[in-house]
A protein has these predicted regions:
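SDR active-site strand-loop-helix element
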Residues: 7, 31, 73-74, 107-113, ...
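Residues forming the Rossmann-fold NAD(P)(H) cofactor-binding site
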Residues: 14-15, 89, 128
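NAD(P)H-binding glycine-rich loop region in Rossmannoid oxidoreductase-like domains
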Residues: 36-102, 113-117
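Conserved beta-loop-beta element that borders a ligand/cofactor-binding pocket
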Residues: 111, 131-155, 159-162
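Conserved catalytic-site region of short-chain dehydrogenase/reductase
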Residues: 113-125, 149-154
Length: 314
């Protein structure tokens, strides 16, 4: 039985990966800084959760020695240049050092579509630097570059559906940016395939769905499927920049940042120059085949509540 160490396993993709690994009879260890945040994983068969920091090279080394491969999922979407560098570059430098010390050669890493040293955003450039660290390490590395990821617990379509419950119109920055959304289950399946198939070593795969949408179309679909459709108004660049700045100043994680806007200067779609999910034997699922089943439940609840109110039962 193969043993897999997962860094960043408590997040959106990590949860689905752990489920897939359990289905495939892998023994999985998830390293997290807060064990309490992984309660949803502790119920899965053959998944162990241990507390620790992925930045602690000394503690990471013996863990790596006990496993057959490590999956690197740790990432942030918002932050400063220094924060992106720490998470997407320095962490991987430490991981490579720990792998060398442990005799661990196999790394499967999730990067991002659009990762490039000359990309318009700090996020994408830091992702490219992280890839370079891994491919220059001499280790057996496979890299997955997903477009925006959707699924039942996503913070993307669910967020836009929720906003349309509250606001009468949705002013939208970056409305014409194009994406090729990919289902989280397909991403998890691709990672398992990379773990299992050594022919993926040294390769980068673009994980994209079968359809291309503008951001405006995606927001409109979120409203439509959730039963809360509102007018979506694209903002000109100057107003979009102001909106993103204000969102950064709000408490909590911003819905959109100025760096996100910079990333959207380039389309987030498959380049056609790298292998995709099909090369891993995966037929990507269409957004329309998945999203109505989780956002549609919101629309059903909204409709029932409206009927109860009309009938005087609310």
């Amino acid at each position: 039985m193969k043993k897999i160490l997962v860094l960043g396993g408590t997040g959106f993709v990590g949860r689905h990966l752990c489920e897939k690994l359990a289905e495939g009879a892998y023994r999985t260890t998830v390293l997290t800084r807060r064990r309490a945040s992984a309660s949803h994983l502790q119920m899965l068969p053959m998944v162990d959760v241990i507390e620790g920091s992925p930045y602690d090279t000394a503690a990471l080394t013996p863990l790596l020695a006990e496993h057959d491969a490590v999956v690197s999922l740790v990432a942030i979407l918002h932050g400063t240049e220094a924060a992106f560098d720490k998470t997407h570059v320095q962490l991987l430098l430490g991981l490579v050092k720990a792998c060398d010390a442990a005799g661990q050669r196999r790394i499967v890493h999730v990067s991002a579509l659009g990762a490039d040293l000359s990309a318009p955003s700090m996020y994408q450039r830091s992702k490219a630097r992280g890839e370079a660290v891994l491919f220059n390490s001499g280790l057996d590395v496979s890299v997955l570059r997903p477009s925006v990821i959707f699924g039942a617990e996503d913070k993307f379509l669910n967020t836009f559906a929720s906003l349309q419950k509250i606001f009468p119109i949705i002013p939208l920055a970056g409305s014409t940016a194009r994406f090729q959304p990919v289902w989280v289950e397909d991403v998890a399946a691709a990672l398992v395939k990379c773990i299992a198939d050594n022919s993926t070593v040294g390769k980068t795969f673009e994980a994209c769905g079968p359809e291309i949408f503008t951001l405006k179309q995606l927001v409109q679909l979120a409203g439509q499927y959730s039963g809360n459709s509102k007018p979506v108004i694209g903002l000109p660049d100057a107003l979009a920049r102001i909106q993103a700045t204000l969102m950064e100043l709000a408490p909590g994680e911003p819905i959109m940042s100025r760096d996100n806007l910079d990333a959207m200067k380039a389309d987030n779609i498959a380049s056609g120059q790298l292998p995709g999910l099909q090369a891993l034997g995966i037929t990507p699922s269409a957004l329309s085949a998945v999203v109505p089943f989780y956002l549609g439940a919101q629309g059903l609840r909204s409709g029932l509540m409206a009927k109860r109110k009309t009938a005087g039962r609310f």
